[in-house]
Amino acid sequence: MSLMLEPNPTQIKEERIYAEMGLTDEEFAMVEKILGRLPNYTETGLFSVMWSEHCSYKNSKPVLRKFPTTGERVLQGPGEGAGIVDIGDNQAVVFKMESHNHPSAIEPYQGAATGVGGIIRDVFSMGARPVALLNSLRFGELQSPRVKYLFEEVVAGIAGYGNCIGIPTVGGEVQFDPCYEGNPLVNAMCVGLINHEDIKKGQAHGAGNTVMYVGASTGRDGIHGATFASEELSESSEAKRPAVQVGDPFMEKLLIEACLELIQSDALVGIQDMGAAGLTSSSAEMASKAGMGIEMYLDDVPQRETGMTPYEMMLSESQERMLIVVKKGREQEIVDLFEKYGLAAVTMGKVTEDKMLRLFHKGEMVAEVPADALAEEAPIYHKPSKEAAYFAEFQQMKMETPKIENYKETLFALLQQPTIASKEWVYDQYDYQVRTSTVVTPGSDAAVVRVRGTEKGLAMTTDCNSRYIYLDPEMGGKIAVAEAARNIVCSGGEPLAITDCLNFGNPEKPEIFWQIEKSVDGMSEACRTLQTPVIGGNVSMYNERSGEAVYPTPTVGMVGLVHDLKHVTTQEFKQAGDLVYVIGETKAEFGGSELQKMLHGKIFGQSPSIDLGVELKRQKQVLAAIQAGLVQSAHDVAEGGLAVAISESAIGANGLGATVKLDGEATAALFAESQSRFVITVKRENKEVFEKAVEAIQVGEVTNTNEVTIHNEENEVLLTANVDEMRKAWKGAIPCLLK
């Protein structure tokens, strides 16, 4: 739409054009009051995008305030590009997770690729070098041709971007459930390393300092992407393909190197990624955080399309762009630095004292808005909340143990469930060894990356069992954080902090808002107990298609510190003769389990329960035993129960098996999904020391028979399975479904 054709302020109000942009009548009235006049078309666009849920968190802020966000190691909590945690020796880890769900639903390759690009920029805009990527993915059932297409394209998009940019994709998770059929979830996480003195903030300090635009030129892609992410998907969503951005990983690779060099210069005052809402959010937020204003001359914006209007330039979400503030008079140094990398750096404005965001185009002022009004003063809504109707019904159900005729067949069927099955088809497409710092590659409980120049490592994982959270949001929220910490501990790491990606349906529905509140309550309690504060994250609402919401999926990304790489532990058995221990008791808990879904095609009843005090005690015991060198292998017991955990530890080893004896009712002993459990192996000579240090029950030993045999307490064989056959079933399940 050219400037001549843009509706005037009166038309915007009378024809309710603001509503098409996502503003409500009340919000438009607030804008009018803030400005003391009717906004023009560009100004209406600025407010609509900055006041969207995606940018302002207007529906979720009251809930997010419950998260614990401070701790003795936390250097930067929520509010900047990414959170930062101290790891000693003047070093820190920077990490964040974000969603790119809506774009991936309609343009899966670019949607996933630009999700990766955006999260990388959040990390290096803090001054950190990105060292690892993870992702957490949710899809419908793979039997559906559309789901196959989305799955293949999303994985290809993540691989395409991550591999080209040279940052290893080291871990993550993929789960499949019918509720994600029309609305897949694509959550990307980036982890970076930084020295304390290099930490940078996205703030525009110093009146008279210069505002510069660096990186790729601006096109019309991604206009209103943030608003598109703040509404439900529908049949007409396909028409919003232009709201999906297009990424160029080679450009971003150059941008990383240029920005990391720039950060060493004392000319730099502030730096921020142009992410959701593009130039609008970066300029308004940088000004607002510094208590300053910004003036920008839009004729100077590098444009790759002709005739772009101020509205289009301000709302474009073209990728690989940063906004920086530099000391006045030092602009040429910056231009020269970026030119060396073949990148543009142009002066386009200055910092002012009056807290206003002013935009000029062709000699005229086209917008004048208080920066704080855009960045900080979005209305906050306390949405009505109502317990979901199904919850009381599920809570009252008497939990029945499923009847199983053949335990071996059931184990093989579980190993072939796509959520449990090997994700090798996925991670084989990712370069997880680039930069040669990856110590534990994908496939174990957590990935581990070396901290160069030290004996330390970073353990990292993403976790969320959304079925448990659907059945019981508060309990499920606790479990999501606890399982992430359990995975870090099993890898030899001390859990440090989390980033989260809260994926939910439409918050305007009271039952959905109840899910959000309750799961955040559970997560917050777990974070406090396990001492893993929330240092940042992202909210993705409106994950619905045709009125059907996804399961509540608050994904947890956790990073832990491996104090010495000698402590690194993996899940596979190490040698015959080692003793197998189980930590934690098994109860007949099948609500939301893989077994329940496989047998009934749906989930119901109560989720497994968790006692966070017990969880913490067990994690501390396991970590201390690992650090004391007593543990050969460690694996958390999750989907599919003990039988699956033991099988996975055997599948990962070569030629090894195990003979174990499990007490209690057989189906529960094998397949229940009780929490706070570990499968640990220990050298025979360490038996006494280990048993003094850890409350664990010896259940058997590792053998060189290449078979897993499980007995009941009467010593009757429940199942014997050949490890090669299990490996073949487990590894072949996803490729077979994709044929």
Curated annotation (Swiss-Prot):
Entry-linked Gene3D superfamilies: PurM-like C-terminal domain, PurM-like, N-terminal domain
UniProt cross-references to Pfam families, sorted A to Z: AIRS (PF00586), AIRS_C (PF02769), FGAR-AT_linker (PF18072)
One GO CC annotation: cytoplasm
Keywords attached to this entry: ATP-binding, Cytoplasm, Ligase, Magnesium, Metal-binding, Nucleotide-binding, Purine biosynthesis
GO biological process: 'de novo' IMP biosynthetic process
Binding positions for Mg(2+) 2 per the UniProt entry: 122, 273
Binding site for substrate: 99-102, 121, 245, 317-319, 540
Role according to the record: Part of the phosphoribosylformylglycinamidine synthase complex involved in the purines biosynthetic pathway. Catalyzes the ATP-dependent conversion of formylglycinamide ribonucleotide (FGAR) and glutamine to yield formylglycinamidine ribonucleotide (FGAM) and glutamate. The FGAM synthase complex is composed of three subunits. PurQ produces an ammonia molecule by converting glutamine to glutamate. PurL transfers the ammonia molecule to FGAR to form FGAM in an ATP-dependent manner.
Protein's name according to its UniProt entry: Phosphoribosylformylglycinamidine synthase subunit PurL
Record organism: Bacillus cereus (strain ZK / E33L)
